[in-house]
């Protein structure tokens, strides 16, 4: 269906003569897979429990002896992941090929549209965004080297959503650095507000044009975001309204952040007052 389509023409942008990176899916090495699971097993804080997702992915790691040391748990993880990795090695290879074929049809048009939307070009020296494919419970991203990881068995719609979501973060933070160079690098990650805000804005950005014309998925952030309320209104609804305004992207980013900062700090103040 997509072979004869040119998304750049469909959404009204030009993709010629522009330096754009390419997402290249690659098979995760066994050691890389082991390292991700070692991290994920002990990650039990933040907006979601990565540990719980890890147990679902590797049920053999559930109910380990509580007397085991971290090094002993690492050894169990190495054995479990090695066994499963070798069992699914051929599928990891075939899924890597499938992911590359599917995303290639969207790569240039999406990255061009994202650059146009955020009013910032991709870094000139960024030729490739590496996406490693393995047996993992979540899709970690690595801002400093423009890469992310993904598991096998992801359907077409979800694959496109993950690619769009993770790479949005890469260019989003390039724009954030341009607007707010004073923000420390550590605040780009959990649990800081700048990070939380970056995860919230994927909904109002990707669910609107031009991206909603390009993709058929419905972008959704963490469930906890949709439970936040500001008086009688949903915070996410108000954030969507901000991003629907006919104002510059810089104004949207700043107004949205100031709003989220006010609401979340107000919520903290109210909890303190009740103590």
Language model region names:
Residues 1-101:
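N-terminal low-structure segments adjacent to metalloprotease catalytic domains
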Residues 19-20, 26, 182-231:
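Post-HExxH zinc-binding segment in Zn-dependent metallohydrolases
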Residues 83-144, 208-215:
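Auxiliary, metal-adjacent structural segments of Zn-dependent hydrolase domains
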Residues 106, 160, 194, 198:
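Hydrophobic (often cysteine-bearing) scaffold residues that line and stabilize catalytic clefts
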Residues 146-148, 174-183:
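Flexible internal linker/loop segments at domain or repeat junctions
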Residues 148-163:
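Short pre-active-site segment immediately N-terminal to the catalytic Zn-binding motif
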Residues 161-177:
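Active-site recognition of the HExxH zinc-binding catalytic motif
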Residues 222-275:
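Pan-zinc metallopeptidase signature
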């Amino acid at each position: 269906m997509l072979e004869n389509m040119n998304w750049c023409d469909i959404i009204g942008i030009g993709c010629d003569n522009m330096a754009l990176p390419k997402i290249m899916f690659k098979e995760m090495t066994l050691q890389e897979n082991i390292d991700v699971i070692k991290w994920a097993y002990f990650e039990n804080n933040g907006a979601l429990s990565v540990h719980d997702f890890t147990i679902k992915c590797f049920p053999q790691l559930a109910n380990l002896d509580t007397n085991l040391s971290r090094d002993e748990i690492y050894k169990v993880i190495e054995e479990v992941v090695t066994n499963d990795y070798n069992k699914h090695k051929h599928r990891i290879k075939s899924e890597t090929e499938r992911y590359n074929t599917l995303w290639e049809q969207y790569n240039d048009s999406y990255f061009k549209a994202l650059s146009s939307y955020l009013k910032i070009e991709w870094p000139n020296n960024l030729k490739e965004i590496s996406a490693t494919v393995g047996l993992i419970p979540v899709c970690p991203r690595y801002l400093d080297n423009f890469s992310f990881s993904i598991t096998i068995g992801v359907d077409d719609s979800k694959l496109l959503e993950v690619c769009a979501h993770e790479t949005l973060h890469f260019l989003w933070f390039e724009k954030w650095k341009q607007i707010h160079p004073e923000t420390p690098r550590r605040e780009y990650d959990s649990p800081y507000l700048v990070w939380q805000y970056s995860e919230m804005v994927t909904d109002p950005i990707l669910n609107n044009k031009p991206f909603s014309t390009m993709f058929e998925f419905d972008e959704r952030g963490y469930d906890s975001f949709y439970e936040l309320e500001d008086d009688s209104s949903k915070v996410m609804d108000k954030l969507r309204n901000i991003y629907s305004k006919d104002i510059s992207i810089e104004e949207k980013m700043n107004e949205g952040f100031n709003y989220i900062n006010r609401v979340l700090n107000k919520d903290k103040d109210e909890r303190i007052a009740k103590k």
